A protein has these predicted regions:
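A catalytic-pocket lid/entrance helix-loop region that shapes and gates access to the active site
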Residues: 74, 81-104
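Active-site environment of divalent metal-dependent phosphoester hydrolases
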Residues: 45-47, 70-75
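Active-site neighborhood of phospho(di)ester-bond hydrolases with catalytic His/Asp-centered motifs
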Residues: 38-41, 64-68, 255-256
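Low-complexity, highly charged intrinsically disordered N-terminal segments
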Residues: 1-32
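Extended, H/D-rich, highly charged conserved domains that either
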Residues: 162-207, 211-220, 224-308
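Short secondary-structure boundary/capping segments
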Residues: 4, 53-57, 78-91, 261-279
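Short, small-residue-biased leader/transition segments that mark boundaries at the very start
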Residues: 4-5, 69, 310
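Non-catalytic, alpha-helical, charged scaffold/linker segments
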Residues: 95-213
Length: 310
C-alpha cells in the first residue's frame, strides 16, 4: 500500500499538480476539522481587505455572523444613510484604506478628492494625519489627509442633522460647531474657552455651521448613489443580513459583539427607542429589526426612521 501512495505522490509531482494537491488537501482538512464557523463581529474594523474576507466567507460551507458596530456602519452606508457613508469614508481615509472603497468596491471618490485638494490646497491638515503606516507615496499621503479633513467636516454636518431630528437620542452635546468662535479660533465648552488646534474651516458658515455647501451636498448625493448602486457591496451586505444578527445562541453559548447596557449593580439597563423602553434580549431584537427594516422596508418613512438607528 505504501508503494501505491508513493507512486501517486510521484505522479502528482511529475505532472505539476503538487501545489494544487496540497491546497485541496488543506481545504479538506479544514472542512473536516471546522464544522461551523462563528464570526463574532467587525469584519470591517479599520483593517485592509474586508471585501476579500467577505468573498471567502460567502464561499464557506457553514457560517454565522454576529454583527459588530463597524459591520452595522457599513450596512447603513450601503443602505444610503449619509451619516454612515461619511463615517465609513472617514475611517478608511484615517487608516489609509481608501483602496477598499475605490478598488475593492469600485466606488468613485474622485469628486471628494478633487474637492478636498481644492478646498484645502494650502492647508497641511496636521490634525488629520493618518493612523498606522499605510503604503503611500508623498502625493497619495497629501491627498488622503485632505480627504480625511474634508469628509470629517461633512460628517459633523450630516450627523448634526440626524441629532436635531431625533432629540430622543440625547446627543445634543455632540453638536459642537456652533460653539466655535471662528474669528478667534477658539471653542467654548461648559463655560471654558479652548484654543483650536485647527482653525481653517472654509466650508463652515458661522451663521449656519451645520449647513452643507453646494459642493458638499453634490458630493454626498453622488456618494449616496454610489453606495446604494454598488452591486458587490450590496451582495456583501445582504450576506451579512442573511447570515447574521446582533446575537446568537449556539450549543448553549450566547454569542454577541460589543456590550449590553447594564446598571451599576449589574442588572440590565433600559434604553428608550421611539419612546419605548427595552433592555437585554429585547433591546438587541428591536435594534436588529430596525437594521433589517433599513434595507427591506417599502415605506420610505419607515426606512428612514430605521436607518437613523443604524
Amino acid at each position: 500500500l505504501g508503494d501505491v501512495y508513493k507512486r501517486q505522490v510521484s505522479t502528482i509531482i511529475r505532472i505539476g499538480r503538487a501545489e494544487k494537491f496540497i491546497i485541496a488537501m488543506s481545504e479538506l482538512i479544514q472542512r473536516l476539522t471546522v464544522d461551523h464557523l462563528h464570526i463574532v463581529g467587525d469584519i470591517y474594523d479599520r483593517g485592509p481587505g474586508p471585501h476579500i474576507i467577505m468573498d471567502e466567507l460567502m464561499a464557506y460551507h457553514s457560517v454565522d455572523i454576529q454583527w459588530g458596530n463597524h459591520d452595522v456602519l457599513w450596512m447603513g452606508a450601503a443602505a444610503g444613510q449619509r451619516g454612515c457613508i461619511a463615517n465609513v469614508i472617514r475611517i478608511c481615509a484615517r487608516y489609509g484604506n481608501l483602496d477598499i472603497l475605490e478598488e475593492g468596491y469600485g466606488i468613485n471618490l474622485l469628486p471628494l478628492a478633487t474637492f478636498a485638494m481644492n478646498t484645502y490646497k494650502d492647508d497641511p491638515c496636521e490634525c488629520f494625519k493618518l493612523k498606522g503606516n499605510p503604503d503611500y507615496n508623498a502625493t497619495e499621503m497629501l491627498m488622503d489627509v485632505k480627504m480625511h479633513k474634508a469628509i470629517s467636516v461633512i460628517q459633523f454636518k450630516v450627523e448634526s442633522q440626524i441629532i436635531k431630528k431625533n432629540p430622543g437620542f440625547k446627543l445634543e452635546k455632540r453638536n459642537l460647531l456652533h460653539h466655535i468662535n471662528y474669528e478667534k479660533g477658539t471653542i467654548e465648552l461648559d463655560g471654558k474657552e479652548y484654543k483650536l488646534l485647527d482653525k481653517n474651516f472654509p466650508t463652515i458658515d458661522p451663521k449656519k455651521p451645520y449647513a452643507l455647501t453646494k459642493e458638499e451636498e453634490d458630493i454626498m448625493e453622488r456618494l449616496e448613489r454610489a453606495f446604494e448602486n454598488c452591486e458587490k457591496l450590496q451582495r456583501h451586505m445582504h450576506f451579512l443580513l442573511n447570515k447574521g444578527g446582533l446575537y446568537k445562541v449556539y450549543n448553549g453559548n450566547l454569542l454577541y459583539h460589543g456590550c449590553v447596557p447594564l446598571k451599576e449593580d449589574g442588572n440590565l439597563k433600559s434604553v428608550r427607542i421611539f419612546g419605548r423602553a427595552y433592555k437585554g434580549k429585547g433591546l438587541y431584537e428591536v435594534l436588529e429589526s430596525y437594521v433589517r427594516k433599513g434595507f427591506y422596508a417599502m415605506d420610505p418613512k419607515e426606512k428612514e426612521l430605521s436607518l437613523i438607528h443604524i
